[in-house]
Design a protein with these regions (language model features):
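LRR N-terminal entry segment and analogous cap-like coil->beta motifs
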Residues: 3-74, 80
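Acidic/polar low-complexity surface segments
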Residues: 66-84, 120-140, 188
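Tandem repeat domain/solenoid detector
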Residues: 38, 59-62, 87-95, 111-117, ...
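Small-residue (G/S/T/A) turn/hinge positions that recur once per unit in extracellular repeat modules
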Residues: 19-21, 46, 70, 100, ...
Length: 194
């Protein structure tokens, strides 16, 4: 750790972060400089106060697992917070644990051609807000040609403004547990399975 950077070499294949790893950083961006990375496994209660998490262009990445209570914010530092995962050709599965990404404003998955499964445990992306403060909050999943299953746990995305699924031609199953997207303002299904 160098003040505000997590330094990872380009030749590693697995990034495994133990529980309670909380460097003093506000953003975590993993991009195409990590050309060999195949697995990301982040433990419990990690990266508190990180308000921007981006994975972009990791073409060898196959699996992303984030355990319980990681990437959590509070109301005061949640403005503009986002989780963006895109342009990862080999990513097959995403599993996000209970109570992770609390107070985050957006979750976007884009251009993940090998992704087959998304599993979000209960209360992921929980944002207890009101009509006035939910503006811009969204869950967007698009351009994932092989995505078959989406499971979103209880209470996730509570009060979010929109839930959008676009261009998911292989989607077979969407399971939304109790209170998922409760009080969601807009739901869009576009260019889905024929």
């Amino acid at each position: 750790i160098d003040d505000c950077e997590l330094i990872v070499t380009s030749c590693i294949e697995s990034l495994i972060i133990d529980d309670h790893f909380n460097p003093d950083i506000s953003s975590l961006i993993l991009n195409n400089s990590l050309i060999s990375l195949k697995q990301i496994d982040i433990g419990n209660d990690c990266f508190k106060n990180v308000n921007q998490f981006v994975i972009d262009g990791l073409n060898e990445l196959e699996s992303l697992i984030i355990e319980e209570g990681s990437f959590t914010l509070d109301d005061e530092n949640s403005r503009g917070s986002s989780c963006l995962i895109m342009n990862c050709d080999q990513l097959k599965q995403i599993h996000i644990g209970y109570w992770s990404f609390r107070w985050y404003e957006s979750f976007e998955l884009k251009n993940l051609p090998s992704l087959t499964s998304i599993h979000l445990d209960q209360y992921a992306w929980l944002k207890i807000v009101n009509e006035k403060t939910r503006k811009g909050s969204k869950c967007l999943i698009m351009n994932c040609d092989q995505l078959k299953d989406i499971h979103i746990g209880r209470g996730s995305f509570y009060w979010y403004e929109s839930f959008e699924l676009k261009n998911l031609p292989s989607l077979i199953s969407i399971q939304l547990d109790r209170h998922a997207f409760m009080k969601c303002h807009r739901i869009v299904f576009e260019s889905m399975n024929n």
